[in-house]
Amino acid sequence: MTFSLAGRCQHTGMVGIVVSSSSPAVAARCAHARAGVGAAASQNITDPRLGTELLDLIKAGTPADQAVARVAAAAPHASYRQLTAVDADGVTGAYSGEHTLGRHATAQDPGAVAAGNLLAADEVPAAMLAAFAADPAAHIGDRLMAGLAAGLRAGGEEGPVRSAGMLICDAQTWPVTDLRVDWDDLPIERLRDLWLVWKPQADAYVTRALDPGTAPSYAVPGDSGR
């Protein structure tokens, strides 16, 4: 019911994740990222706590592959979970429990990991990784969106997807991008549209938080200042 891609930009250190599902509000439950730490997915029959546990372990110094193995070994009902993680060093890990639904697969490259369940084709995660790797100089958000779209083209889920989301962290303590389409007939297309609106404004919103006196105007009716 879900396919996801988590990645790290080797040039900027940004980390992020995209995810799509036939279930509503998938990003609210499955996508996790933390600045300077990494990104993780807890999916299939989801326990959102596991994404937090993965990032806590990575922050404490555990490489992503070992963090995934430790959480999978210790978590109750781990056989129902599918987990992935990428850390700030580009180490990746993936796990699919024996009760992962339907056709399922994972794929890993240095700096990126993809996984899916109830897939229409085994090649979906590999297609996502290939698209993410195609332009290493591009913004991580563009690369993540390319990966998500490639996963859909490769078959995506067995059924139609209905939600999607993107989460990206940079140097700040908050996500610099947190976009969600919680229910739509074409959620990946809508997420792409949101990204194209958000991308040129994202840096300005960081400036408004850190140094509002130099931030650009909102350029909306009634805004006479910053």
Briefly describe each language-model feature range.
Residues M1-R226:
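N-terminal nucleophile
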